[in-house]
């Protein structure tokens, strides 16, 4: 049985999503990754999914494109996919 996760969009993620659309990024790529995560599917290796450390410990990051990232967290006991941020490396890390 496939478990489907409820998706929680933070207010910051909503702003980041609108910014991605304004930048004319391919939103379908982001939506496809969100769908895969919500359906508990493993992401392809090209997305470089990995755990984060520091201020983002407990979250994961995957690459939508080389300089377009998605931060997310899956809370298994609640079956919730939380989407705190998306953006470029400089948007997210200030570099």
Annotated model-derived regions:
Residues 87:
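Residues forming the ATP-binding cleft of Hanks-type serine/threonine protein kinase domains
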Residues 1-66, 75-82, 90-95:
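Basic, Lys/Arg-enriched alpha-helical interface segments
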């Amino acid at each position: 049985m496939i478990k489907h996760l409820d998706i929680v969009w933070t207010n910051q993620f909503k702003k980041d999503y609108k910014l991605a659309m304004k930048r004319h990024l391919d939103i379908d790529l982001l939506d496809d990754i969100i769908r895969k995560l919500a359906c508990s599917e493993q992401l392809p290796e090209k997305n470089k999914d990995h755990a984060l450390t520091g201020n983002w410990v407990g979250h994961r990051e995957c690459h939508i494109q080389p300089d377009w990232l998605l931060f997310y967290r899956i809370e298994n006991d609640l079956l919730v996919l939380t989407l705190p941020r998306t953006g470029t490396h400089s948007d997210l890390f200030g570099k």
